[in-house]
Design a protein with these regions (language model features):
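Active-site-adjacent beta->alpha loops and helix N-cap segments on the catalytic face
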Residues: 99-107, 215, 220-232, 251-253, ...
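Short beta-strand/loop segments at the ligand-binding rim of alpha/beta enzyme cores
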Residues: 62-67, 116-120, 236-244, 286-301, ...
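Terminal amphipathic helices with adjacent charged low-complexity linkers/tails
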Residues: 95-109, 153-166, 197, 207-224, ...
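Glycine-rich beta-to-alpha transition loops that act as phosphate-gripper elements at the mouths
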Residues: 71-76, 123-127, 184-188, 208, ...
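Bateman/CBS regulatory modules and CBS-like beta-alpha motifs in cytosolic regions of diverse proteins
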Residues: 51-63, 70-72, 101-141, 146-148, ...
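Glycine-rich phosphate-binding active-site loops on the catalytic face of alpha/beta enzymes
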Residues: 89-101, 264-276, 318-333, 362-395
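Catalytic cores of alpha/beta
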Residues: 80-81, 254-259, 301-319, 363-377
């Protein structure tokens, strides 16, 4: 047995000891959630616009804003993940799809923009215009380099070349640009590439070696995106970062390998109960087989759960048992922990070894401030992003207002489509759901939502006198509030006549 798996067995065995306790001692403590507390304002020299929202998702992946989109099939596919990364956060592709499709979603994110596309999509000289058009449509690109069998660049075909062609069965060699083809040598910087693109009024610059073999592609779109989104979350090659969800079954190791080959930056073993034998063994197995992949595991709600995962070498721990707006785990099973206490306990259990992700329970931007002040380094949200343009699904009209659908991965419909294993129910003919399907108001572009959330976070940091999230975690203090205090916190004794973009009940 591999060392990591032996360690998992030791952790499991040690936690089985000492379970018995008197009935009167089984109410362990009081637990709190976001609405139960407020942060105490303090002396501040910090202006909100000067705050720094840099944080870590895992030990090896950083973000410029501490926001993650959840791996839910009504929240995150490639379109959402692309925009989350551009804004400086990170999106996690859900796993309610075949592994090949999930890998393709990851690939779309990695190819969406780049400092230099390292392995550009190409076609051979005998390919048809129909094939070229299909490839451009599939990957949302405007041109394709044409290469010989040995990889030597011979031309490029763009959508302008296809614009007035009626015979799509022609080979690309008859239409492609081959004479006076502008190229750049290996080692060309983006600044140099920008000058060449501008000088020749072209949109794509192939990068070739001394033998004429295609080694990369620089596009004007990527240069524009770099200016438009200067704080984008990117890897060392200038590509947008993306995460993806896997389960804890034996088949998910192969899924993890395929996603790693597709270029995924972070994998999350996404289960309802991360402090279970099956998940601990899966973490140990994944750590042995894919030691270089950034691995998140969850969900947990206790210090013991977080400590067990940290001991097995995960790169981050995801916290939340039942706080989500579309989750019914706590009322169906009677099990869970209010989110603020869960985060604090998990932070204590992690003991600084790995970052903690607070997953769920966010209704307002103030909840994000509280989660980060409690010790989380990032906050994962689902319903908050579900009503945006980038979320999967179409908006619909109801009683004159626009909505989009959101469903928990524990809802009956989601479980029937593949997420039942998240709740350890993949073998039954009947399912016991732990989530619901609902609608949320349409919110427009996710960038608008992120702007409001980041603005609320910056203001909260200003009130607390924290210039960075690390300072917020170290210096913030809470007070408990009564139900009367909570009522006082919200608008009261008035009728709202104009809705604010960051306040909805």
């Amino acid at each position: 047995m591999a060392e990591a798996q032996r360690r998992a067995v030791r952790i499991i065995d040690s936690e089985r000891e000492g379970k018995s306790m008197p009935a009167s001692a089984r109410i362990v403590k009081e637990a709190l959630t976001f609405d139960d507390v407020l942060l105490v304002p303090g002396h501040s020299l910090v202006h909100p616009k000067d705050t720094d929202l840099w944080s870590r998702v895992t030990r090896g992946v950083e973000v410029r804003i501490p926001f993650l989109s959840a791996a839910m099939d009504t929240v995150t596919e490639s379109r959402m993940a692309i925009q989350m990364a551009r804004e400086g956060g990170l999106g996690f592709i859900h796993k309610n799809m075949p592994v090949g499709q999930q890998a393709e979603e990851v690939d779309r994110v990695k190819r969406s923009e780049s400092g230099m596309i390292m392995n550009p999509i190409t076609l051979g000289v005998s390919a048809s215009l129909r094939q070229a058009l299909a490839l451009m449509t599939r990957f949302s690109i405007s041109g394709v380099p044409i290469v010989e069998e040995d990889g030597c660049l011979v031309g490029i075909i763009t959508n302008r070349d296809l614009q007035f062609e009626t015979d799509l069965d022609l080979p690309v060699r008859d239409v492609m640009t081959s004479e006076k083809l502008v190229t750049a040598p290996v080692g060309t910087t983006l600044d140099d590439a920008e000058r060449v693109l501008h000088q020749h009024r072209i949109e794509k610059l192939p990068v070739v070696d001394e033998s004429g073999h295609l080694r990369g592609l620089i596009t004007v779109k990527d240069i524009f995106k770099r200016r438009q989104y200067p704080h984008a979350c990117k890897d060392e090659h200038g590509r947008l970062r993306v995460g993806a969800a896997i389960g804890a079954s034996g088949d998910d190791l192969e899924r993890a390998r395929v996603l790693a080959d597709a270029g995924v930056d972070v994998l999350v073993i996404d289960t309802a109960h991360g402090h279970s034998e099956g998940v601990l063994r899966a973490v140990a197995r994944m750590r042995e087989e894919l030691p270089n992949v950034q691995l998140v595991a969850g969900n947990v709600g206790t210090a013991n759960g977080a400590s067990a995962l940290a001991e097995l070498g995960v790169d981050a721990i995801k916290v939340g048992v039942g706080p989500g707006s579309i989750c019914t785990t706590r009322v169906v099973t009677g099990v869970g922990l209010p989110q603020l206490t869960a985060v604090m306990d998990a932070v204590d259990g992690a003991a600084g070894r790995v970052p903690v992700i607070s997953d769920g329970g966010v209704k307002f931007s103030g909840d994000i401030v509280k989660a980060l002040a409690a010790g989380a380094e990032t906050v994962m949200m689902g319903s908050m992003f579900a009503g945006t343009d980038e979320a999967p699904g179409e908006a619909f009209l109801l009683e004159g207002r626009r909505f989009k659908t959101v469903r928990g991965m524990g809802s009956l419909s989601a479980m029937e489509e593949g997420s039942a294993d998240r709740y350890f129910q993949d073998e039954g003919r009947k399912l016991v759901p732990e989530g619901i399907e609902a609608r949320v108001p349409y919110k427009g572009p996710v960038s608008d939502v992120i702007f409001q959330l980041a603005g609320g976070l910056r203001s909260g940091m200003g009130y607390c006198g924290a210039a960075t999230l690390e300072e917020l975690r170290e210096s913030a203090s809470f007070v408990r509030q009564t139900s009367a205090g909570l009522r006082e916190s919200h608008p009261h004794d008035v009728r709202i006549t104009r809705e604010a973009p960051n306040y909805h009940l």
